[in-house]
Amino acid sequence: MSIRDWPAAERPRERLLEQGAISLSDAELLAIFLRTGVAGKSAVDLARHLLRRFGSLRRLLEADQLTFTRQLGLGPAKYALLQAVLEMARRHLAEKLHRQSALENPLVVRDYLKSMLRHEPHEVFGCLFLDTRHRVLTFEVLFQGSIDSTTVYPRQVIKRALAHNAAAVILCHNHPSGICEPSPADRVVTRRLQEALELIDVRVLDHFIVGEGDPLSMAEYGWI
C-alpha cells in the first residue's frame, strides 16, 4: 500500500508537521528524505530495508558515494542531496558556535566536533582556535594519521595559534574504533601541547575525543 493511502495520522510527513521530527522513528525520517519507494515497497518499507542493510542510520549517513549509490532506491541524486543536507547541518552548528563563547555552549561544541570528525575513517587531529573571550575564531584539521595513530607536532599547533592570534584552544581528535577512552599517548600529547602553548600564553581549555556517542571531554575528567 502506498503511503498516500495510509490514514493521515500515520503518514510520516503529516506526523512530523503535527508532532515534530523528534516523534518519528529513524525509518520514518529516512522515508521523508527518500520521498518515494520502489516497486513493491513504500518509502517506509524501503527505509527499513536500507537501515537493515547499513546497520544504523549513522552508517547510512556516513557511507561513501560508491557504497551509498549501489543500494536499492538510492543513486547519485540522493547522495548529492544527502551531502547538501549534512553540510547545511554542519554550517548551522558552526554559526551557532561563532555567535557566543565556546565555554557557554559546551553542547554545541560537542555537536560541532562530532559532525566534523566522527565520519573520518582515519585518525584526525583538529583544533578550535578561540579569542580572549573564548569565542571561536576558526576550526582547522592539523594532522591526519593512520587508522591507529596520528603524529602531532606542537610547533605546528603553535604556528597556527599565532597566525590566528588565538588566546585559547580546544583540541580534538577522533577514534575510528568508536571508543572514546583516551590512550596513554593521548594524555602525553595533551600535556606536551599544554606545555608548548603555555610558552606563548595560549591556554588549552579542553581536549575532546570523538567516537561513538557523545565526545569525551578530558577536562571534565580532570586530565587537563
Curated annotation (Swiss-Prot):
Keyword Disulfide bond tagged: no
Q: Which UniProt keywords apply?
A: Hydrolase, Metal-binding, Metalloprotease, Protease, Zinc
CDD domains annotated for this entry? MPN_DUF2466
Q: Supply the name of the protein.
A: UPF0758 protein PFL_6051
Q: Where is the MPN domain?
A: 102-224
Q: Give the family, as the similarity comment puts it.
A: Belongs to the UPF0758 family.
InterPro entries linked: MPN, RadC_JAB, RuvA_2-like, UPF0758, UPF0758_CS, UPF0758_N
| Positions that bind Zn(2+) | H173, H175, D186
PANTHER family in the record, alphabetically?
A: DNA REPAIR PROTEIN RADC (PTHR30471), UPF0758 PROTEIN YEES-RELATED (PTHR30471:SF3)
PROSITE patterns in the record, alphabetically?
MPN, UPF0758
UniProt xrefs under NCBIfam families = PRK00024.1, radc
Output the Gene Ontology terms for molecular function: metal ion binding; metallopeptidase activity
Q: What's the domain of life for this entry?
A: Bacteria
What biological process terms from GO does the record include? Answer: proteolysis
Q: Give the residue ranges of motif JAMM motif.
A: 173-186
